[in-house]
Swiss-Prot record:
GO annotation terms (biological process): asexual sporulation; sporulation resulting in formation of a cellular spore
Gene Ontology CC entries for this record: endospore-forming forespore
Descriptive protein name: Small, acid-soluble spore protein H
Gene for this chain: sspH
Highest taxon in the source lineage: Bacteria
Organism (species): Acetivibrio thermocellus (strain ATCC 27405 / DSM 1237 / JCM 9322 / NBRC 103400 / NCIMB 10682 / NRRL B-4536 / VPI 7372) (Clostridium thermocellum)
UniProt family annotation: Belongs to the SspH family.
Amino acid sequence: MDAARAQQIIESDQVIEVLHEGSPVWIEKVMDNNMAHVSYIHTKEEKDVPLYMLVEKELPKNFH
């Protein structure tokens, strides 16, 4: 994921599912060094991860 998209997700009114190594995360902050501060939804653990390791989960094609 790039920094611009991560920032769009933070600012969005919608809930957009983002995964880090298969685990759902909430992006807390995009940092200048191509890192993001995230919190893991199921464990509440927080850490800094590289933006390239974040994946936006796509909605099913038949989702309306």
